[in-house]
Amino acid sequence: MNLQEMNARKEKIRNFSIIAHIDHGKSTLADRILEQTETVSKREMQAQLLDSMDLERERGITIKLNAIELNYKAKDGETYIFHLIDTPGHVDFTYEVSRSLAACEGAILVVDAAQGIEAQTLANVYLALDNDLEILPVINKIDLPAADPEMVRQEIEDVIGLDASEAVLASAKAGIGIEEILEQIVEKVPAPQGEVDAPLKALIFDSVYDAYRGVILQIRVIDGSVKVGDRIQLMSNGKEFDVTEVGIFTPKAVARDFLMAGDVGYVAAAIKTVADTRVGDTVTLASNPATEALEGYKEMNPMVFAGIYPIESNKFNDLREALEKLQLNDASLRFEPETSQALGFGFRCGFLGLLHMDVIQERLEREFGIDLIMTAPSVVYHINTTDGETLEVANPSEFPDPTRIENIEEPFVKAQIMVPNDFVGPVMELAQRKRGIFLTMDYLDANRVNIIYHIPLSEIVFDFFDKLKSSTKGYASFDYEISDYRPSNLVKMDILLNAEKVDALSFIVHKDFAFERGKVIVEKLKKLIPRQQFEVPIQATIGNKIVARSDIKALRKNVLAKCYGGDISRKRKLLEKQKAGKKRMKAIGSVEVPQEAFLSVLSMDEE
């Protein structure tokens, strides 16, 4: 292809993604677009084709990014090349959204005709606006009885400030309005900028590990072109690799001769470890490198940490391999080895949020068959010590001695909660209970309110979302971003079983709630830990002070069963003997702690 043909081809390219709140019909719309453009034959069509992980289909959420090339013959008789880049809609995966948006020029905003705009839709729209994308509103599910497209249209204009007069009314399920959406993409989404003959510059927006070909990079070529045999260089670390294959996805990988400016596709280059390829890095040619890297890429910092331990201690290396493999596809997962007296060897893992943590745990168990114990998630605290040091601690068992602590700062988030009018009371009550600080409240329309709070991340970490859903009958939607660190009156609480500290059960708690939390946990553990042959005291302590205690009574055999009538001194002798045996057992006995016990530290309801 000569330069002229390449430029003509570039004018026909449209790169776009679909933004939507969970369940507003994004994956279904993507399916319809694939059918309409005949990318996938009816025979291969399965619901949510782009959600290729089993877990995604089951939970009905999109986690990883998928990029697909489609050909669309428009009404003007020309054939256009569409690249549809699927984005996850869940708050934990905002970074994945931001990188897929960086690879696009346009975005389809899908809003449910019955539910209107939700908090996460807003968050993603702002990301799209930051990337200067052309946004095409689509009002989906207009065939629902409760649909009110006109109200939603007004809402898009009022809340986001987009002109929604030309918003397409669609039903992805019934296939209504799909043609219109495709025509709007042709007309409104700009063709890619970028020079075909400039030095290669391409953005990595995802990487997938393949056992045979090594790491496969998903890239959006901004300038230049790349073909098999080129030697590429990664700009963040200067490492070089030889390209062995380039191609596109039509969901299936199809090899091509080259990729040029505007294209979205994949490159395989015998890259052994995914650690070499950072998502958001810039790829260029070693022989003719670009002068500067693409901007807008940041390292993701995990916000939530938890210990992951294999139940069988000989599976430690399998767990390490499994985590390394997951990390190949998941740039935001961090882990380092740690040991616990109670649980043996395992890893401290960092996650973007709770859903991310859940998904990783499920994938470890499902794809690698490893049985795990997870400890309670915690956040990163900043501890200022009396000798002027600042420590960053994510694991409660690493907290320094209380006498050395000057003060502790914890991360706060700015939480945006959208909720129907009737539930404002319960939501505010919940936020206050979680130590939230009220900021503002805006009425979006006559019956929906947007409430903004500052809440400590540690309070959101375990059950805030579930509580929010149950106190608003599932109507609230919620989005948060990290705001800053603030000093808080926090203490570390340890749990002692049989007078031994179980490090995996330690947690950090606000001083005002310490007493009742201690009480709740001790009672919960009493129910969860099976009775032993000897009595087990459970104590909650802060420093050396015991704040709550409960005892698990011993199981005992009735040693008097074979004394009929019998002499009292004979009975006493047997009982004394039993007591001495129990005492010996208690001295050497260890207590088995079931997985539920670790999780009970999390679900700290005051029930």
Swiss-Prot record:
GO terms for molecular function: GTP binding; GTPase activity; ribosome binding; translation elongation factor activity. One of its GO terms (biological process) is positive regulation of translation. Its EC number is 3.6.5.n1. SMART domains: EFG_C. It is a peripheral membrane protein. Keywords: Cell membrane, GTP-binding, Hydrolase, Membrane, Nucleotide-binding, Protein biosynthesis. It catalyses: GTP + H2O = GDP + phosphate + H(+). Required for accurate and efficient protein synthesis under certain stress conditions. May act as a fidelity factor of the translation reaction, by catalyzing a one-codon backward translocation of tRNAs on improperly translocated ribosomes. Back-translocation proceeds from a post-translocation (POST) complex to a pre-translocation (PRE) complex, thus giving elongation factor G a second chance to translocate the tRNAs correctly. Binds to ribosomes in a GTP-dependent manner. NCBIfam families: lepA (TIGR01393), small_GTP (TIGR00231). This is Elongation factor 4. It comes from Lactococcus lactis subsp. cremoris (strain SK11). The lineage of its organism: Bacteria, Bacillati, Bacillota, Bacilli, Lactobacillales. The gene is lepA.
